[in-house]
């Protein structure tokens, strides 16, 4: 257990991983350590047979391939750290390949659904102004909800319509917004923001007490707008992020630009959206082409 704790400290202090990422590593490693304990094995004395047994154990529990790949990545990183620290001479997991991942196509909103949500946005009350700004910002920028709640007013460049956001691993990037978002931002800052800002907060999106709005409350605001639009769908802030990426690619944006705007580490992560656009192309073709209909 002490080696796991040392590794997690390394991820936090040296690698600068977020608390959420470190918690994911913790869960994977504790689960693995419990498996070893149940089989009377020491985490420092593992051979190829045990690694295969663990892989078999994960499959038998019905865990999907993507989750298994993540768990193996966590464990592989742990053993590579032990090799780096000269606690072990080699990693028992380097010879274990990740299972081929299942293709996961993220859910996104179509134009009709998106327009319905925007059509019920209003500025009738301070809460309405805030809700409108939240939807506008999420769709205009493609940012994560964790990035949205941490935007500070000073991070916004209203002249250039850009925002500095703090992404995963505390990495900064610049995202852009449009005229619709600019209008919603002006209305909010000139009215609702002053009503909510009872504690002289530096954050943009505030609750009624003047504190930073929570991720959970933003999800509630989105749910309320979806119900108001009479849509029988369940969406999250991440659905809007997926919609941003899909729409950008469908309208001709290149993959590298979308990658930078989303704050992805790898182009492979962004490329999942090309599968979505290809599926849409196929669907449109089959619906529209005379011979495809028959």
Give the location of each predicted region.
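Conserved catalytic core of the tyrosine transesterase superfamily
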Residues: 1-294
């Amino acid at each position: 257990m002490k080696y796991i704790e040392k590794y997690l400290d390394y991820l936090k202090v040296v690698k600068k991983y977020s608390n959420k990422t470190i918690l994911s590593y913790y869960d994977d490693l504790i689960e693995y350590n419990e498996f070893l304990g149940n089989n009377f094995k020491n985490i420092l004395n593992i051979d190829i047979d045990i690694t295969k047994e663990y892989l078999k154990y994960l499959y038998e529990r019905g865990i999907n391939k993507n989750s298994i790949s993540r768990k193996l990545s966590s464990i592989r990183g742990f053993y590579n750290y032990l090799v780096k620290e000269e606690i072990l001479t080699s990693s028992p997991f380097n010879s274990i390949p990740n299972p081929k991942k299942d293709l996961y196509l993220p859910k996104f909103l179509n134009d009709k659904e998106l327009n319905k949500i925007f059509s019920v946005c209003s500025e009738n009350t301070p809460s309405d102004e805030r809700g409108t700004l939240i939807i506008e910002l999420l769709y205009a920028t493609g940012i994560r909800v964790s990035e949205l709640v941490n935007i500070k007013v000073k991070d916004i460049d209203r002249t250039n319509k850009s925002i500095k956001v703090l992404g995963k691993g505390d990495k900064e990037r610049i995202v852009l917004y449009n005229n619709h978002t600019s209008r919603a931002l002006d209305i909010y800052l000139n009215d609702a923001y002053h009503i909510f800002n009872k504690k002289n907060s530096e954050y943009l999106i505030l609750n009624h007490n003047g504190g930073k709005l929570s991720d959970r409350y933003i999800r509630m605001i989105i749910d309320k707008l979806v119900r108001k639009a009479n849509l029988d769908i369940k969406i999250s802030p991440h659905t809007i992020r997926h919609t941003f990426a899909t729409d950008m690619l469908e309208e001709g944006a290149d993959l590298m630009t979308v990658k930078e705007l989303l704050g992805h580490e790898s182009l492979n992560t962004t490329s999942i959206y090309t599968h979505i656009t290809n599926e849409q192309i196929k669907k449109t073709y089959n619906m529209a082409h005379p011979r495809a209909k028959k």
